[in-house]
């Protein structure tokens, strides 16, 4: 399975807004949700319970975002900034790392603090 950053974003923002554990999201196939939660757990962005059988994630429950997960969710909340990140980081090279994306988002946020407040959701 290939990592899909829109799916990652959707999971993080859903977990952040939820007051209860998440075991799936409408519009995301269960197998895709489970594997992306596993990636988020491995990256230290969520606290999750995973059921893994023969190296496949067969169930996942996300309890909460970690501190790092909260920070990343804050950075990707704005639809405008997220689209800009996709256009400038994710699409041009097709090859990137999570750390590159995080650093780009941090730079954009710090450079645009006065204007980002007006971007909305």
Regions found by a protein language model. Name each.
Residues 32-46:
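Basic amphipathic alpha-helical segments that dock to polyanions
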Residues 78-121:
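Exposed, interaction-prone assembly regions rather than primary DNA-binding/catalytic cores
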Residues 58-89:
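Short, amphipathic alpha-helical interaction segments positioned at domain boundaries
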Residues 48-51:
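Beta-hairpin "wing" of winged helix-turn-helix
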Residues 53-56:
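Short loop/turn motifs at secondary-structure junctions and domain boundaries
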Residues 1-25:
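Short amphipathic alpha-helical interface segments
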